[in-house]
Swiss-Prot record:
Coiled coil: none annotated. GTP binds at residues 10-17, 66-70, 111-114. Residues 131-151, 206-234 are annotated as: Disordered. It comes from Saccharomyces cerevisiae (strain ATCC 204508 / S288c) (Baker's yeast). Interacts with ROY1, YIF1, YIP3, YIP4 and YIP5. SUPFAM superfamilies: P-loop containing nucleoside triphosphate hydrolases. A lipid is attached at C232, C233 (S-geranylgeranyl cysteine). It holds the Pfam family Ras. This is GTP-binding protein YPT52.
Length: 234
């Protein structure tokens, strides 16, 4: 089993916690309270990499740090992303300034961590809430039977996708509420990390097997970090 550290970043109310809980517990809570500081969860997936002519199952365990988005907690974020293998940077597609705030997080990651072997995934959340363009006519009965007000998309898919391509980021739009695209996020990350770390994985596997470990091989691939303040609890 391979172990990777993953961190979620983004401003308050973009849906970071909802994405994590949809992935880990397959639940959604409309009234979820804001995260204080950070929350830790873990979940495993199976990927099917093709090494040469052989396809095999590989189990990946994600150690997930869900950080608070409020401004007063922003200074704590480096404690959690410093030695992460992957970062999910989340924005709200219905809020006009949300993508710019996500860009700021990406800039911070690249400046303070670097992106040589850090997988950064840009996520546009809340696709379930919006109509693609403003409606020219509104019927008084148009929301009859509906529980949720529809919103106008404020950030186009094309704008966010182009930015992600320019920055070398993975990109996807998702809905934590319906689950659309959420599982695919973590499959994408698992496959990308396996490809990036393949040589290191094989080397560590061979050393463990050569040392007499013929059972399950557990490999922690968390990025090294000096004076890491989270080392006592991660």
């Amino acid at each position: 089993m391979l172990q990777f550290k993953l961190v979620l970043l983004g401003d308050s109310s973009v849906g970071k916690s909802s994405i994590v809980h949809r992935f880990v517990k397959d639940t959604f809570d409309e009234l979820r309270e804001s995260t204080i500081g950070a929350a830790f969860l873990s979940q495993s997936i199976t990927i099917h990499p093709n090494d040469g002519n052989e396809t095999k199952d590989v189990v990946i365990k994600f150690e997930i740090w869900d950080t608070a988005g409020q401004e007063r907690y922003k200074s704590l974020a480096p404690m959690y992303y410093r030695n992460a293998n992957a970062a999910l940077v989340v924005y709200d597609i219905t809020q006009e300034d949300s993508l710019q705030k996500a860009r700021n997080w990406v800039d911070e990651l690249k400046n303070k961590v670097g992106d040589d072997d850090l997988v950064i995934y840009l996520l546009g959340n809340k696709v379930d809430l919006c109509q693609e363009t403003p409606s020219t006519e509104t019927s008084p009965d148009s929301n009859e039977g509906g529980d949720e007000e529809q919103k106008v998309r404020a950030i186009s898919t094309e704008e966010a996708k182009q930015y992600a391509q320019e920055q070398g980021l993975l990109f996807r739009e998702v809905s934590a509420k319906t689950g659309e695209g959420v599982k695919e996020i973590f499959q994408d990350i698992g496959e990308k990390l396996y490809d990036l770390k393949k040589d290191e994985i094989l080397s560590k596997q061979n050393r463990q097997i050569g040392g007499g470990n013929n059972g399950q091989v557990d490999i922690n691939l968390q990025r090294p970090s000096t004076n890491d303040p989270t080392s006592c609890c991660s």
